[in-house]
Amino acid sequence: MTNTKYYPEVSSNADFAAIEREILKLWQDNNIFQKSIDNRIKDAEFIFYDGPPFANGLPHYGHLLTGFIKDVYARYQTIKGKKVERRFGWDCHGLPAEMQSEQELGISGRLAITNFSIEKFNSHCRASVMKYTGEWEQYVTRQARWVDFKNSYKTMDTHFMESVLWAFKELYNKGLLYESMRVMPYSWACETPLSHFETRLDNSYRERADKAVTVSFMLRDKLPHSEYKEYRIFAWTTTPWTLPANLALAVGSDIDYALVPKNDICYIIAAASVSKYAKELELKGDEQFTIIKGSELEGLRYKPLFNYFENHPNSFKIFACDFVVEGDGTGVVHMAPGFGEDDQILCESKGIELVCPVDNSGKFTKEIPDLEGLQVFDANDKIIIKLKEQGNWLKTEQYIHNYPHCWRTDTPLIYKAVPSWYVKVTNFKDRIVELNQQINWIPSHVKDNVFGKWLENARDWSISRNRFWGTPLPVWKSDDPKYPRIDVYGSIEELEKDFGVKVTDLHRPFIDELTRANPDDPTGKSTMRRIEDVFDCWFESGSMPYSQAHYPFENKKWFEDHFPADFIVEYVAQTRGWFYTLMVLSTALFDRPPFLNCICHGVILDTTGQKLSKRLNNYADPLELFDKYGSDALRITMLSSNVVKGQELLIDKDGKMVFDTLRLFIKPIWNAYHFFTMYANADSLKGKSDFASENVLDIYILSKLKIAVQKIEKSLDNFDTQAAYHQVSEFFEVLNNWYIRRSRARFWKSEKDADKQNAYNTLYSCLETMAIAMSALVPMISEAIYLGLHNTVIPQLDYGISGDKPGAQDPIIKSQDGIRGCRNDNLSVHLCNYPKLSNFEVNHELVATMDTVLDICSNSLFIRSNENVRVRQPLASITIISKHNDKLKDFEDLIKDEINVKAIIYRDDLENYATTKLSLNFPMLGKRLPYKMKEIIAASKKGEWEATASALAICGETLKSEEYKLVLEPYSHIKGAASFADNSSLLILDLELTPELIKEGIARDIVRFIQQARKDADCSITDRILIEIISESDLSKIINIYGDYIKEQTLSEFAKDFTPDYVNEIELENHKIQLKIKR
């Protein structure tokens, strides 16, 4: 008679990567992703915005991390009944694309691009930005992330760009845009200004050594009431290259300045800085100087260092202001309004127009003939030499400071006056701060700290770039200043109406060719021409919510229903990037926050804390890890770590962390599934989802199941994958190491009675329910388990040679409410509804008692380990000292069997066995009560404290729960003791071994030896075997005494004179023992 097998014969050492590949194929062949969306009603949607990546490079670990998080919540909300569209997007414009194209074309700089042809350059950019889309799809698909690539949006699409134009015009009409020549962070390598927030991206500030120089300026005016032949004032700067453009000096009104005489010259320097220049000024240290306030220097004229701008109006005067800091440098700041924000503000207020003798590539112009064509940083030495020759130099020093670098080229930025269009963020930043309070940030401190403080200090946003590949600013100006006019366009229709041509491409140079006569010029000679600038690509990504829908030109209702997003996620630096630009534009255009929940994850570094990079070769290719361990393992490694809480994750190159996840998280899940299929197939029994068993272990594990399912749901509702993974792991720990182990006899027995069926049903219910509950967290392994439980053949899984394969013709057993409930037909776990288990009530009293039983067992193991007593060695007794022993007596036999003792002694006089000690959290208490620590420590040692259920009083202070811990400490004369985690109980194992106990322990070791030999001999779990045990006389006596026990536990019979299939030999208690097996 053939043995009917209803489940796959899965291996305990499964190739999870191979299983995942089969799952991916099954999903694709059956269009499961689309089914998961179509199954859900449109009225219940979960709105998710997918931040667009650049496709001109391969995905890295950071992309995968973000993708895993996105996928978890999209899958989870789907099984919660929501419709979750996952439209992918591509960021196409901006510096990344331009820099790559310049490199590939072998050209560099604006002039070279113009000579090459803007049209050809942009055409190359268009192709390059989609270079790696195939690889992106491969990575994203392999990581089991479901996204809609077919309907992806691209920021270079005409419809997307048109919505960006609309947003610009809306801001213009609201009076929230202006054009100005202002000092901005400037990338001379990219020949473009950057926004202030771009200088904070990707740790763009880094340590840099610069030459700081102190120079003297000769005053043209003398100080009143002071007679010296000559007056000089010292200024200190870390940017010597800005000195040729100096137009003013700034001092602090209330700062004290010393008049330091030397050889008929009076030197002026902040009094607090005199000692720093004692050597240069040849001071002894005991001199007394005349002190004046900075306000007394106001308006004094000085002679310029160089003659380049000596006739510049209103210049070369000393001004008092409030931004000069005492102790910095000399207390005197040189002002070059073309290269400093404060400089520009001060000089403008004094009627000094800025000068900017540096071109777009960071080189001096002909206005500085001595330095023309020289890069500014390369000019420092020449400037210092000239200052020495002129007698203006006092000191040069190396100055190490954090300095902003270009986030694309890694070159040091300069600050330079450039014309740009700005969003008046300062006009409505208070409203942004208000709307930020409506957002749930994860981690929570981002709301008011990282992001909140950034918003409070927000500046106006420069949104124009003098580049080529981007959405052009829709601004046309008259080319004749006699007849000024500005036209701003917000749609293609408006452009076509005014210019009378069909517009099919909004990119340069095509858009630049649109010209028309200036309507405000009666001569008809001037022309309206578009300004050359394109948008900052961050403006485009910040426009993603409406631009992806081509709002407001179409899909108006769709956008209104899909704004704001329920959820977005990126790494924490996007608080200065995408999150910020979304917030600015959403507030300005719609007066609403753009998203309601936002996860800011941390960064992934190597084990030494360095960034992952090809140059350092410090990370493994993710595809290699996927092929070796599977992507579920990498998903769990990342999302169960603190990186989801905004912290760093250090990952090794060799994949050990991922392997450990496979071993410690996935294998226990698979082991439970393997156990079920192995024994169910051996018994030709099917499990079903059934919660009606009255067996106490079944009730307990089903109660733990419902609790775990509820906690996973709560964790994911709170956007906490770390907690959710912990719940999954904790449940399978109990399922494997308690329920299955304590129920083995029910699965092993030959009778196919109701108790055995209940055991199978209970284990089936746990596996099926958890497969659904954890499907977003472990999507492919959950799928394999679910499909296996529902008789779906996965080709990679071997069903064996003998017996029948799972019968697809068998009727599907319908589970109780809440497990399935949408159109599924068992095609996929991802088409199910999240389990509610509403027809099953948790037995909380049983759970509490059984959890105590588990604590007793685990503490007993702890004692055995500490005392070096093996688990198979029986002990005489355990003493349980507790106030709550009554409930344990129902489980006395279970406890004795589990911890291998002959008797349990119950006591309640805890005070005779242990004392409660107070353990303080010194780091935390030290921060809160630094001046009381000595007193508190002394009182804790004397026992001068009082504890209640929720607090502890000591030295007049009430300690918080996290600031202390109460520890139950056994008296020193008591051996073999351990306390419960809650300090409510104490256990004491009797460690004295009698000869009888030792013999029984040896018998148990022999059983273990035979069971291992069965595995090594490839015996199936149902095979009965013949064994012969050859040993020395002492062991033979023990074997004779415990023979029946040995045979029962190992499904064996003793025999002699047979030809063995397997032979092995070990040493036991210093005696050799040989085992022969015949199947």
From Swiss-Prot:
GO molecular function, one term: aminoacyl-tRNA deacylase activity
Magnesium in keyword set: no
Motif ('HIGH' region): 53-63
InterPro entries to which the protein is assigned, alphabetical: aa-tRNA-synth_I_CS, aa-tRNA-synth_Ia, Anticodon_Ile_ABEc, Ile-tRNA-ligase, Ile-tRNA-ligase_type2, M/V/L/I-tRNA-synth_anticd-bd, Rossmann-like_a/b/a_fold, tRNAsynth_Ia_anticodon-bd
EC number per UniProt: 6.1.1.5
Keywords associated with the record: Aminoacyl-tRNA synthetase, ATP-binding, Cytoplasm, Ligase, Metal-binding, Nucleotide-binding, Protein biosynthesis, Zinc
GO-annotated cellular components: cytoplasm
Residues annotated for ATP binding in this entry: 614
Cofactor list: Zn(2+)
EC category name: ligase
Positions of transmembrane segments: none
Record bears the keyword Transport: no
UniProt subcellular location: Cytoplasm
Source species, domain of life: Bacteria
Catalysed reactions, semicolon-separated: tRNA(Ile) + L-isoleucine + ATP = L-isoleucyl-tRNA(Ile) + AMP + diphosphate
GO BP terms: isoleucyl-tRNA aminoacylation
Major subcellular site: cytoplasm
Motif 'KMSKS' region: where in chain: 611-615
Domain notes: IleRS has two distinct active sites: one for aminoacylation and one for editing. The misactivated valine is translocated from the active site to the editing site, which sterically excludes the correctly activated isoleucine. The single editing site contains two valyl binding pockets, one specific for each substrate (Val-AMP or Val-tRNA(Ile)).
Annotated function: Catalyzes the attachment of isoleucine to tRNA(Ile). As IleRS can inadvertently accommodate and process structurally similar amino acids such as valine, to avoid such errors it has two additional distinct tRNA(Ile)-dependent editing activities. One activity is designated as 'pretransfer' editing and involves the hydrolysis of activated Val-AMP. The other activity is designated 'posttransfer' editing and involves deacylation of mischarged Val-tRNA(Ile).
Quaternary structure (record): Monomer.
Family: Belongs to the class-I aminoacyl-tRNA synthetase family. IleS type 2 subfamily.
Protein name: Isoleucine--tRNA ligase
Species of provenance: Rickettsia canadensis (strain McKiel)
